[in-house]
Amino acid sequence: RGAKVPVKILHRGLPGKAIYYGDSSLLDLAPGAHVTAEALFNSATDPTGKGLHLRNFTAKGVYILLYQRGDPTYDDTNAGALKYLPQRIARTLGETIERSYSEREGAFLRALLLGDKKYLDEEDASNLSEVGLSHVMAVSGLHCCFLASLIGSLMGDRRKKLRCAVTIPLIFLYAFVTGLTPSILRACIMISMGMIAPLLGRDNDPPTSISFALLLILLKNPFAIASISLQLSFSAVSGIIWLTPKLTKRAHGKHKLVRAALLSFSTTLGAMVFSTPLACYYFGTLSIVSLLSNLLCLWLVSVVFALGLLSVLIAAAVPQLGAACAFVPALGIRAVLAIAGLLEELPFHAIYFNTAFSVAWLAYVYAIF
């Protein structure tokens, strides 16, 4: 059985980040451990040497792939360093989820909180993807907003400066814990600018915030422009900025529940308007029921995120309370998975872009839009 881990190469003149493929003993190492080994070097853009130009690794700042040769040696001396705290937090949260939740619910919560989808049941993953809910399994700006909302609910709206001072460091810590993907980094920057602007007597300007976020990300790694998550994240938020305010104008004066439903619908439609062509291109499918699935489940996912995170933090501090704290979030997880399963069984719930007709249909829809 093999394993792979991201590593930093401690050698002058070589790019710092790489993916190391070795044996299963890598899984037992603590974040920050040193690995000394003979390894085969391959370019991340052309690992087979056949002239390929892959961008999925370089978009994440990875330029080298290492393949273990021989027996490595390990040194855990540096594993407790402060800079590896986010990785240790991620491991602790994952282990706590495993102890407190059943296999199915724990796999969902692990994907929701940490973006770790490898434990997710194949059928559940397929159902979520088919009905347009796969984005809740990829840690992104949505999850960052969930966390910021949770902190705001716990602290209240009175002490804005204190809430800003607490929220911004915590969302950036969460970003590091979950891997600092372009989509979540974008959200951290936009949320930070949105919270700081009123304190400085300025209006929050979403187009400026999203442009500044993109500039910072590309300055750090220009190859990140090829990241699918970056493209989907920025296209979704651009759609929300452009379309959602136009749609939510009709919600004024409506009943509270109707207003909430219209806001959810408008936000989902805004997120889809620019991201749908990209999703169809990369994944070859369009979920027809995605508006319905998001309307039914997104509010529930936000509740599961908040209660699930609180339950895991409590269980990490007091393991004896783990099962009790997990009861309510587990019910929410089962409900989300049940709704996804029911919607997936509907006929014509998705369109697959494997023919010229389906591509022409999508182009026609956008032409009349």
Where would I find each of the regions flagged by the language model?
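Amphipathic, well-packed alpha-helical segments that form the structural scaffold of globular domains
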Residues: G94, E98, L113, S129, ...
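Alpha-helical transmembrane segments of multi-pass integral membrane proteins
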Residues: I240-F348
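Proline-centered turn/helix-capping motifs that create local helix->coil transitions or kinks
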Residues: Y101-R104, D205, I225, A340
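Hydrophobic alpha-helical transmembrane segments
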Residues: A81-K83, L113-K118, T178-I184, P207-S209, ...
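Hydrophobic alpha-helical transmembrane segments in multi-pass membrane proteins
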Residues: E122-L291, F353-F369
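Generic structural signal for well-ordered, non-membrane alpha-helical segments
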Residues: L82-P86, A90, E105, L185, ...
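N-terminal transmembrane-helix/juxtamembrane module of multi-pass inner/ER membrane proteins
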Residues: Q87, R91-G94, E344, F348-Y352
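Membrane-interface helix/helix-cap signal primarily in integral membrane proteins
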Residues: R1-H135
